[in-house]
């Protein structure tokens, strides 16, 4: 019946909102445990290294590496990436400034570090190496698909360590490796590590405006046992993450963007996490670190070896990330209904390829989904109509049997069987539609392709709310009309008032929803109105519906 339908619609939205809260925002931050200024350089597999700071009195310089999609700033002290600009992602809608993913500022930092530890590693307890490079600015030239930038350091024994950054055209995957030349008479033992370090306190503007919950901002990793696991920054110090795995990756997430170091596919790697410089008296103080260590490498005397891996710095582009590391594409977090959301996204992407507009693609996918669900909707309204016709008989049963619930239930089941009516027929189609709506919700919320994607007129960004609230008002108006045209048997005055206020409540809630999602709901309501009109006309011919309420 209509009351159940409305209540289920309310439940649908509440479930989607709760899933949003639980999936994107994990439990509240815990009080950080006290810690001293712990070393950023990880312990090698051979043992701990004493505390040290990243700072050094040695002179160092900043290098600029530029491809067609990335602009990196590399500090010759340690060879850390201290800034990363995504050249094809703008800072804001209408802005020509590229989005800055990695940065190092006095108030906060988010950087990608890498080095060599182990017995003969150059990143040790005393200081990190200062590399030299042939220039300070390097760019991918026209006609070339790859940019290789080497930096060199020679230790006290004369061993040469060449750290290389490899940037490829149209790729957010950066190769980072070391070419080590051992000129000594003894073997060298080194271990590559790559890690990300970020201030625990969330950056300004990281929360979604309005009533929507913030996107997940924290660490994540993948191992042989855990395909995809998220770790809150506030918990990373207590978690004491130490996972041995083949392949795998360790990264940090920021809604549409991810940075991740990948492991060696055919060897045992170690994923680790910790918090440094934590002050127990200051909430969210210190820095979170997550990284991956490759296996120990032994370089024979008077020989050379290469050790390294790749680093993803960019938007969550599923196909490209899947090619870089297994399960890295799972950072596009569609929640528990990923098996529905994934094909929906592929369909949405296909439609966008045909029409070239994400808003039009949303309209088309809504019509397709509603078209597929039409037989279920027809079955739902037919069942509701039959149940409505049974109301006089059900009322007579209640009057005749009184409070005898057992006899009442038995008599009702016999009546349903005799009249060939399924009492759950009106609910079942809605239960099927619910996961589809929630999955589409996640698809629209998690897909970076919709970031700053325009539709038409005033809708210049489908990933944010409608600036003039036109779509939420249309959604409320169409919902009110659906309610008005649908027959109801509600006689209780309180229930009638609740039903009347539902369009207002939904309108208010959708004021802060992304305009892409609201567009879906408006189009869905319009299609529902058309479908209901057709279904009611068919039911009228069968004597199951009357336009008079």
UniProtKB/Swiss-Prot annotation:
Q: Tell me what topology the record assigns in the membrane.
A: Multi-pass membrane protein
Question: What Pfam families does this protein's entry cite?
Answer: 60KD_IMP, YidC_periplas
Annotated segments matching region Disordered: 35-55
Residues annotated as coiled-coil are none
A single GO CC term, please? plasma membrane
Q: Name one GO biological process term.
A: protein transport
The principal localisation class reads membrane
Transmembrane regions: 6-26, 349-369, 424-444, 462-482, 503-523
Which keywords annotate this record? Cell inner membrane, Cell membrane, Chaperone, Membrane, Protein transport, Transmembrane, Transmembrane helix, Transport
Q: Where in the cell is it found?
A: Cell inner membrane
Single GO term (MF): membrane insertase activity
Q: Which family does it belong to?
A: Belongs to the OXA1/ALB3/YidC family. Type 1 subfamily.
Q: What PANTHER family does UniProt report for this protein, alphabetically?
A: CYTOCHROME C OXIDASE ASSEMBLY PROTEIN COX18, MITOCHONDRIAL, OXA1
Q: How does it assemble?
A: Interacts with the Sec translocase complex via SecD. Specifically interacts with transmembrane segments of nascent integral membrane proteins during membrane integration.
Purpose: Required for the insertion and/or proper folding and/or complex formation of integral membrane proteins into the membrane. Involved in integration of membrane proteins that insert both dependently and independently of the Sec translocase complex, as well as at least some lipoproteins. Aids folding of multispanning membrane proteins.
Protein name (Swiss-Prot/TrEMBL): Membrane protein insertase YidC
Name the source organism. Answer: Tolumonas auensis (strain DSM 9187 / NBRC 110442 / TA 4)
């Amino acid at each position: 019946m209509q009351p159940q339908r409305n209540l289920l619609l309310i439940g649908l939205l509440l479930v989607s909102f709760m899933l949003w809260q639980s999936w994107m925002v994990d439990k509240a931050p815990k009080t950080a445990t006290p810690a001293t200024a712990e070393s950023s350089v990880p312990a090698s597999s051979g043992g701990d290294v004493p505390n040290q700071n990243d700072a050094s009195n040695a002179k160092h310089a900043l290098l600029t590496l530029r491809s067609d999609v990335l602009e990196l700033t590399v500090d010759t002290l340690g060879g850390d990436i201290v800034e990363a600009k995504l050249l094809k992602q703008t800072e804001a809608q209408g802005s020509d400034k590229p989005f800055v993913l990695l940065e190092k500022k006095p108030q906060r930092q988010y950087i990608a570090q890498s080095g060599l530890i182990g017995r003969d590693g150059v990143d040790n307890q005393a200081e990190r190496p200062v590399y030299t490079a042939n220039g300070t600015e390097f760019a991918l030239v026209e006609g070339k698909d790859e940019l290789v930038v080497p930096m060199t350091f020679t230790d006290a024994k004369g061993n040469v360590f060449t750290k290389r950054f490899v940037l490829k055209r149209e790729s957010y995957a950066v190769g980072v490796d070391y070419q080590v030349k051992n000129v000594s008479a003894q073997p060298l033992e080194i271990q590559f590590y790559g890690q990300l370090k970020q201030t625990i306190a969330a950056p300004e503007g990281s929360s979604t405006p309005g009533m929507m919950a913030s996107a997940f901002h924290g660490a994540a990793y993948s191992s042989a046992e855990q395909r995809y696991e998220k770790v809150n920054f506030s918990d990373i110090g207590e978690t004491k993450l130490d996972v041995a795995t083949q392949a795998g990756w360790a990264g940090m997430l920021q809604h549409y963007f991810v940075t991740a170091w990948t492991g060696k596919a055919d060897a045992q790697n170690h994923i680790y996490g910790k918090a440094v410089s934590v002050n127990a008296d200051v909430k969210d103080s210190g820095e979170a670190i997550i990284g991956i260590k490759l296996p120990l490498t032994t370089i024979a005397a008077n020989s050379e070896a290469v050790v390294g891996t790749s680093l993803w710095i960019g938007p969550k582009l599923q196909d490209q990330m899947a090619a870089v590391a297994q399960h890295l594409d799972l950072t596009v977090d569609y929640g528990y209904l990923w098996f529905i959301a994934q094909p929906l996204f592929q369909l949405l992407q296909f439609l966008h390829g045909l029409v070239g507009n994400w808003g039009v693609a949303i309209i088309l996918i809504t019509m397709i989904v509603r078209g597929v669900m039409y037989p279920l909707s027809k079955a739902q309204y037919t069942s509701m109509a039959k149940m409505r016709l049974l109301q006089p008989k059900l009322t007579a049963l209640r009057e005749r049997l009184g409070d005898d619930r057992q006899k009442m239930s038995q008599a009702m089941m016999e009546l349903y069987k005799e009249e060939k009516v399924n009492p759950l027929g009106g609910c079942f189609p809605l239960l099927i539609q619910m996961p589809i709506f929630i999955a589409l919700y996640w698809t629209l919320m998690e897909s970076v392709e919709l970031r700053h994607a325009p539709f038409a007129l005033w809708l210049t960004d489908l990933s944010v709310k409608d600036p003039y609230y036109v779509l939420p008002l249309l959604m409320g108006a169409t919902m009110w009309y659906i309610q008005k045209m649908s027959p109801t048997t509600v006689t209780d005055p309180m229930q009638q008032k609740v039903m009347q206020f539902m369009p207002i409540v939904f309108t208010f809630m959708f004021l802060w929803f992304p305009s892409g999602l609201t567009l879906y709901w408006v189009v869905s309501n319009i299609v529902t109105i058309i479908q209901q009109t057709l279904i009611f006309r068919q039911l009228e011919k069968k004597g199951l519906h009357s336009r008079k309420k």
